[in-house]
């Protein structure tokens, strides 16, 4: 049907007969000549039709609506000098049409303009409902091509190092991994269910037990969790696993992979090794294990200075084992008013939404500290000197303080730090600040359920477990550091991994630590325990979020911009109206009865 696409055309094609196919992006009638911007997947070309080309052809061109699918044949000409479009690669050319065929008419009015000339801020819900039209706008297609390039570069890199791509099952066993599973009823086993995998974690470990040595997969994963801009119920991981490797070898190898992706996609070189930071240092200084290191405002611990000054909120926090922490906003006295950090203010609200009761503040004015009387009246000169030394605050700076539960203080000041950095334009958006976060605790305590939860997952190997006695081992495990690592970029987690447990006894003890009984372990993970007893090699790996990597590389705000047909924030596909009801006969086949609570 066609012998060229738009972007292939150049000055060497002048005078040649070409066939092109595409959409009418825009039609204009100037002085009896019809100009049509023809759009295909590669770009644009102006085509011209005038009455001298034939009455029928001209009449047909007059009726063309935007987005009509056409095929045209004609001669490539050089545009007149005064009509050259320097914004297009084909802006010096035009096609003088000899023949035009309509391949498909527009039946209905379009729900939104597709032409880049008419591009408007279309609501995302409408874009998702008519995703095929949104794709035609070009930007999404470019995003998908970038995604494809990332996958292509990754495959080539891993193939060159002897990795084997293996597909693991999508219908698998429901196991407790953190988020809710998507369940699939098994018709041939009434009352039983498959689960869609939250990750290929256990299967890739079993591949290592099977001797594969080096594995990767572009893996579809599914998690039934609350959504946000960087989450979808189904998402894609670049999943990697290796045998007989150390933590250092895994980090070094995967750092090279990430550098290769950035080089091939953005032509950016990173010559130095990515910096590293322990989990504890990240929490102490940033309040999060995903720190954005492009700007300062580090958290500072003021518990030793302010815990005993007699201010009730501070006293209670320290007595309860909590924190008093601060961030310093340089020049904050002039850029942030009291209204914004008091109840009803936007910064106060950010802290409150993160669980804090509020914010205290201190303004540095010369050698004096300005704050509420209950704090200021109890500050000695020594207190003031210590505060200024720890916070590194100078004249004109604003110190914001949080006090209370450790987790809430860290979380609220982290959110406030991010909010202020964006608000005051403190972030250098040209920077790519990669960071390896290492030495995660194996577990965190769930006080509500009176048990431990794995910070990553219960298949991470703990460091320095020496005891073989079950009771002593259990105590060591509870307080251990994991052989785990995350790669963070500009405050977002790109991927995470660990060395895995390859000894059956240790794996059983770790699963007991998260609250499983021996019976539950055998029911849920018996196949894994049995495999580890049959000569499992030391192994480890990592999984990168492909959607998130693509989002960062294209500069998008949501991973929905990297996926051809994403779900909305209610986990619905607006294009197909999924999920939807199914017929009674389908439910009957599965012996499923639906009851809905009023």
UniProtKB/Swiss-Prot annotation:
Q: Which domain of life is it from?
A: Bacteria
- Site positions (Important for tRNA non-discrimination): 30
Q: Where does L-aspartate bind?
A: 177, 223, 456, 500
The family database entries (PROSITE patterns) matched by this protein are listed as: AA_TRNA_LIGASE_II (PS50862)
Which residues are noted in the entry as ATP-binding? 223-225, 232, 493, 545-548
| EC assignment | 6.1.1.23
Kindly state one GO CC term assigned in the UniProt record.
cytoplasm
First and last residue of the signal peptide: none
Q: Where is this region: Aspartate?
A: 201-204
What is its EC class? ligase
Q: What InterPro entries does the annotation carry?
A: Aa-tRNA-synt_II, aa-tRNA-synth_II, aa-tRNA-synth_II/BPL/LPL, Asp-tRNA-ligase_1, Asp-tRNA-ligase_1_N, Asp/Asn-tRNA-synth_IIb, AspRS_core, GAD-like_sf
- Which cell locations does it reside in? Cytoplasm
Give any GO molecular function from the UniProt entry.
Answer: aspartate-tRNA(Asn) ligase activity
Query: Which family, according to UniProt?
Result: Belongs to the class-II aminoacyl-tRNA synthetase family. Type 1 subfamily.
**Name of the molecule in the record:** Aspartate--tRNA(Asp/Asn) ligase
Q: What is the native source organism of this protein?
A: Prochlorococcus marinus (strain MIT 9215)
Q: Which gene encodes it?
A: aspS
